Amino acid sequence: MTMKSLMLTTAKAVGVTLLTSLAAHAAYFKWEMIELPASTGATCGNGTPYRFFVNRTPLNSKAVVMFEGGGACWDQSACKGGSLLNAVNPDGIPENYMSDWNRQAHLGLVTPFTARIHPLQAVQTQSWNIVYLTYCTGDVHTGNKVNVYNNTDPANPMTYFHRGAINAQAVANWMAKNMPQPDHLLLTGFSAGGVGSTANYAAFRTTLKPKKMALAADSGPLFNVPRTATPEQAPSVLLHNKIREVWGLDGPEGLVTQLISKYPGAGDVNNMGSITAGLGKIFPNDRIGYTMFQEDTNFSAFSYQKFYPEIANAATDADRLKMLNVKWRQEIAPWIAQMTPTNVGYYIPNKRDINGSHCTTIVTFGGTSIVEQKLNHVGEFIDNLLDGKGPVMRAYETKPTTQRVLLSDMFADWLAPLIP
């Protein structure tokens, strides 16, 4: 047998093997529903089974895990859902979640990270294994507590399972057993998922043991808020201290308690925001990144509106937004100041019209430029985190342009009114 014929025979054998593998695993390149058994402790807030979705590829072992966003809750009304800041998916996750356009995932198109081919944006993880970690627990993927809420309907109390942290760990365990060890892993999430990806980073890191790993947490900042701070010092303190209790964050089995117990260098149990920099300290070879807008109107409302009557009862919506942004901007500076590890970075443009300047990575990366630093969009930050070359990017827009100069920004502005 000649070398040429040997190579041809070998190539054919490899091709047949690959095709056989693809045929044997019909779920490649499409969404596969995974329902976690009750024995894992995983559940949605209403007690229904927890389901998440996987879109696999046989071509590499790299993986991106997307933590879904949505509102949150700590009372009966909000846990029933129905409005922007309330719990999303209050009735659980149906089996057809990723094929139902009316669901928040929008067939995976909600972010460029969760679509093989996205009509508006390319990102290198589109060729990776994709895991969509759904959100149905009203606790920004961090809780481990069961509560009974009856404040709006005492005759019909609601038992609600804040099991976000349990769900996340169960997903990581499933991945470790059913998927290859990742050569490269990106943990990301938007809004509530931005918090979730940050808070559960260590769990995925230690469970999956990827060769390389990065975090891109979008618009779910854990601000630098000591437990004993006053509202004047740290406006988010009322929110932080509320969710500590209702979601069991620093209870004996709480996520914060367990994280700091395992990794004392990760931060301080009395300041949940300390993990922002803490991840860079305990995982010095990883690249840790945070992104959001300076004029975010949604997460700021979640953080302050229920706790400050002057905001909730503002005379006009413009007044409400102005008061929200004053508090929001007050907390950005100390949040950034604590990011001292050199492997921690951020990308913080001023605003865009899409979704009330909430989330830089949903729909499209357009509208996220920082022109003064010659950065076209947040995708350059994502590439910086993933490529692992040079210092981790730190970009903060200080000179917002009064008129768009990039076509991608103009397109995002045109698109904004079309997005519900």
Language-model-derived ranges and their functions:
Residues 12-21:
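Bacterial N-terminal signal peptides
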Residues 8-11, 169:
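Generic alpha-helical structural signal
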Residues 1-9:
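N-terminal secretory signal peptides that target proteins for export/translocation
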Residues 22-26:
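Sec/Tat signal peptide C-region and signal peptidase I cleavage site
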Residues 27-420:
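C-terminal His-loop and adjacent cap/lid subdomain of alpha/beta-hydrolase
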